[in-house]
Amino acid sequence: SKAHIMSLNINTANDADLAEFLSHNGFCEADANCLQALHPHISPLLPALTEAFYERILASDAMRPFVIDRVDSLKQTHLRWMNMLFSGPFDDQFVQIHQHIGEVHLKQKIPPLFVASSMAFLRAEMPKLFTPELLEKFPQYDYAFCTSALLRLIDTCQFLVDRTYYQSLMELLGISPKLFLRLMTSSSKQPA
């Protein structure tokens, strides 16, 4: 709904796809407030998560070539990004940052598989940070609420980065979004 979108100061007037995504995703001001409240307690735990993430990436023959030459700077960038998931702000700048991330990935020739794998790792590991000991300090939030807020935000990040890949592919092929959608959803089988 527009109330959710406006409460986060994301202007979707010229972005129908983002408006539609956010209307289904449901990330709202209460989610943002939860993540921001947890941030000071979560922030010290994020460096270990970054290390675990890059250990996994470096162990992968498919992913290692994309990071091996700049692991230290990428770890710093990743850590700043994970902190932003909790600190915000969740506004037009947040949208622009994620579009920029997609553009950088394109320039670096980082495949969409990397983003999807990264987000899958975070969806599995980040909710583990919401321990009972941490949540005791925040009686207004339970594990399910905190996890839902975080997962909604990670999904939004992936949507914003992924669509940069699709937009680039459309530009490369010289096709419109409507044709791209038709090509993606058309069946290769002819009706019998």
Residue locations for each model-derived region?
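Short, charged, low-complexity loops and linkers
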Residues: 28-40, 102-110
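Long, amphipathic alpha-helical coupling/dimerization segments that relay conformational signals between
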Residues: 3-10, 24, 83-192
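Exposed alpha-helical structural elements
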Residues: 17-20, 30-37, 62, 73, ...
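Charged, compositionally biased N-terminal leader segments and the immediate start
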Residues: 3-33
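N-terminal "first-domain core" detector
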Residues: 24, 32-65
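Structured interaction and signal-relay segments at domain junctions
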Residues: 53-86
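Short, well-structured alpha-helical interface segments that form or flank functional binding sites
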Residues: 44, 48, 52, 73, ...
